[in-house]
């Protein structure tokens, strides 16, 4: 990820964070925060479904720009969700950096081992 990409995510996250205490009648993000966990999480599910459908459309000759737009919507709502749970893009970036260089199989095995250790097993 380039520094400018990370900066974009962090700037957007800062705007989203600033909406936490905002007027739900004046801000879509404030409205989502005000509605609580279920509304935020439902929106993630809706946007993820739209990404899947747009990806399938691309395979059928649909516009790739539609897929990009849907992924942007999903990423935006993921940023809202992270903020709602007092997390930030930096937390996700740190986790991706931690995983970098590990195969998916290695990462999954390490995660399972860590979970067993945390659960006393």
From Swiss-Prot:
Q: Where in the cell is it found?
A: Cytoplasm
Q: Which UniProt keywords apply?
A: Amino-acid biosynthesis, ATP-binding, Cytoplasm, Histidine biosynthesis, Hydrolase, Nucleotide-binding
Catalytic activity of the protein: 1-(5-phospho-beta-D-ribosyl)-ATP + H2O = 1-(5-phospho-beta-D-ribosyl)-5'-AMP + diphosphate + H(+)
One GO biological process from the UniProt record?
L-histidine biosynthetic process
Could you tell me the superkingdom of the organism this chain comes from?
Bacteria
The keyword Nucleotide-binding belongs to this UniProt entry's keyword annotation: yes
Q: What pathway is this protein a component of?
A: Amino-acid biosynthesis; L-histidine biosynthesis; L-histidine from 5-phospho-alpha-D-ribose 1-diphosphate: step 2/9
Q: Major location, coarse class? A: cytoplasm
GO CC entries: cytoplasm
Instruction: Give one GO molecular function term.
Output: phosphoribosyl-ATP diphosphatase activity
Q: What class of enzyme is it?
A: hydrolase
Q: Read off the InterPro entries from this record.
A: HisE, PRib-ATP_PPHydrolase-like
EC no. given is 3.6.1.31
What the record says about family reads:
Belongs to the PRA-PH family.
What NCBIfam families does this protein map onto? histidine_hisI (TIGR03188), PRK00400.1-3 (NF001611)
Q: Which PANTHER family match?
A: HISTIDINE BIOSYNTHESIS BIFUNCTIONAL PROTEIN, HISTIDINE BIOSYNTHESIS BIFUNCTIONAL PROTEIN HISIE
Q: Which protein are we looking at?
A: Phosphoribosyl-ATP pyrophosphatase
Q: What is the lineage of its organism?
A: Bacteria, Pseudomonadati, Pseudomonadota, Betaproteobacteria, Burkholderiales
